[in-house]
Amino acid sequence: MLEYGFKDDSLSLHTDLYQINMAETYWRDGIHEKKAIFELFFRRLPFENGYAVFAGLEKAIEYLENFKFTDSDLSYLQDELGYHEDFIEYLRGLSFTGSLYSMKEGELVFNNEPIMRVEAPLVEAQLIETALLNIVNYQTLIATKAARIKGVIGDEVALEFGTRRAHEMDAAMWGARAALIGGFSATSNVRAGKRFNIPVSGTHAHALVQAYRDEYTAFKKYAETHKDCVFLVDTYDTLRSGMPNAIRVAKEFGDRINFIGIRLDSGDLAYLSKKARKMLDEAGFTDAKVIASSDLDEHTIMNLKAQGARIDVWGVGTKLITAYDQPALGAVYKLVAIEEDGKMVDTIKISSNPEKVTTPGRKKVYRIINQSNHHSEGDYIALYDEQVNDQKRLRMFHPVHTFISKFVTNFYAKDLHELIFEKGILCYQNPEISDIQQYVQDNLSLLWEEYKRISKPEEYPVDLSEDCWSNKMQRIHEVKSRIEEELEEE
């Protein structure tokens, strides 16, 4: 493996083999430079949630900026996988020269609407599919899970503690960033803190107490070396040993330390948090926080709150960073138009499963916002050249059950797509994480509460324009007619 300098010197091979096989087919057939349009979207909202939070654009930008096959990549493709030298030489000069339109990170996204649109030579658009899906599928999933948890926690602090349970190192780092986009305040991952300039937070492990054998000594030694102190109190006996020793050390050190609080990592968190709060208050530490961890997620936190738990800070790890209850988003990347004789021709994929029938053509996504109450009426997918006139009433109808419709007036239409790359040139600046966090909250304020319920939310409208819907029906008819003609000829 090291023969090819395998040190992750590029991400261009972060793809499925069939992408390279298709690229060679396009190239040898001379259609590789045809302009193609692909769209990235998902079919079902994760966690049975009412919305998803888009994350992954920064990583996608980094990937596309550096999309280039290295010498070691090409040596591997030729020597080990058997690609011919002429194709290898073509790949040597390849980079991303297309355009990317995308929703911004922190945008609320919904099923069957294009999150990203790639307009590029066919071979380039094909080769980047796997990586873009890999990036968006994971990070959007984690940001959405984080937003669900934060929605339950409210104004209390949420900390990302999942690094050791993440699926690997980069997943931990980018997952930490996605968690902050979803509303978390800090991460335990120091690498993520350095890489993204985000807050880091941490306490100590049970090993510290075990190493010193008793809690008093362990807490005292920790206080001697750290100004900010959170003591983990459940190594032996939370109420009879951990809490009394934490309070003892906090009193002994006084103003020499910043006694932030205590952490509970096991046991009956509702009962223990109430007892710990009482002990802290009686000792005069009314500002000290009760921090809880231990396989938390939005459902557990809701139950703890229902039981009156006195928890101020929530450390969430495994069930966030692994998207424990739904470990895959299922986003797809589909060809919607391709160049034929100098003109763009819409393409469609048809399936016996209605939800897998794609919507053809180059499209835009608008958020239709009521100007009176500042709430969203739904998202409106239109063909690229259509004009959404906010001076006229707009008909919105369900794309499958078309009898479900409404007319909207007094609205403004927000175009959700931003130009990120134009002909291979980056023309977008990534915002700060704090700005993305605020953008999420601003977007959530547009939704009615019914769409934000943790359990059984109302379905948010994602509608097609009449032209977009008619175009889809026409393409379905054309494909079916062509198949019938071919069968008759046989």
UniProtKB/Swiss-Prot annotation:
Coiled coil: none annotated. The lineage of its organism: Bacteria, Bacillati, Bacillota, Bacilli, Bacillales. It catalyses: nicotinate + 5-phospho-alpha-D-ribose 1-diphosphate + ATP + H2O = nicotinate beta-D-ribonucleotide + ADP + phosphate + diphosphate. The gene is pncB. One of its GO terms (biological process) is NAD biosynthetic process via the salvage pathway. Keywords: Ligase, Phosphoprotein, Pyridine nucleotide biosynthesis, Transferase. The keyword Signal does not apply. Catalyzes the synthesis of beta-nicotinate D-ribonucleotide from nicotinate and 5-phospho-D-ribose 1-phosphate at the expense of ATP. Its EC number is 6.3.4.21. GO terms for cellular component: cytosol. The modification Phosphohistidine is found at residue 206. Belongs to the NAPRTase family. Pathway: Cofactor biosynthesis; NAD(+) biosynthesis; nicotinate D-ribonucleotide from nicotinate: step 1/1. NCBIfam families: NAPRTase_put, PRK09243.1-1, PRK09243.1-2, PRK09243.1-4, PRK12484.1. This is Nicotinate phosphoribosyltransferase. The keyword Ligase applies. InterPro entries: Aldolase_TIM (IPR013785), N/Namide_PRibTrfase (IPR041525), NAPRTase_C (IPR041619), NAPRTase_N (IPR040727), Nic_PRibTrfase-Fam (IPR007229), Nic_PRibTrfase_pncB (IPR006405), Nicotinate_pribotase-like_C (IPR036068). Transiently phosphorylated on a His residue during the reaction cycle. Phosphorylation strongly increases the affinity for substrates and increases the rate of nicotinate D-ribonucleotide production. Dephosphorylation regenerates the low-affinity form of the enzyme, leading to product release. One of its GO terms (molecular function) is transferase activity. Gene3D superfamilies: Aldolase class I, nicotinate phosphoribosyltransferase. It is an enzyme of class 6 (ligase). It comes from Bacillus subtilis (strain 168). PANTHER family: NICOTINATE PHOSPHORIBOSYLTRANSFERASE (PTHR11098:SF1).
